[in-house]
């Protein structure tokens, strides 16, 4: 699919109106992502908004707020590993990773077409440490995690800032 056109200049204007200054190197990939999202949305209904501007102000701006919070308020003693369960349209993940690239970020999506969308975006706009994992966020995911590090259960011990989710059963 050919992406809809989103102007980086419009994107910079929208960001300024929302209280953000986007780096030059972020504008083109973020505009490209929004264009792809709008194009795929016509066929797959990824988001409820119908224009790139509405999508920016109702959805993408949340990613920018989250990125600001993570940069300014959360201090981790080790590189974080984030799991975005039910990533769908790549929100908040893809815009977030365009402005905050600490550690690893896994977008977990069960639906094949949505996982394909996420993979397509990452193929066109590579984001370091950002991955798509197509699996249901249930038993299969937890079994896969058991073979790796206990990322989720140790998150509270790694961060010196606020803890958002600690899945460990033992205190």
Predicted features, each with a name:
Residues 1-77, 113-130:
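Class I SAM-dependent transferase core
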Residues 89-102:
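Conserved SAM-binding loop of SAM-dependent methyltransferases across substrates and taxa
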Residues 37, 96, 169:
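Residue-level signal for inorganic ion chemistry
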Residues 76-88:
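Conserved class I S-adenosyl-L-methionine
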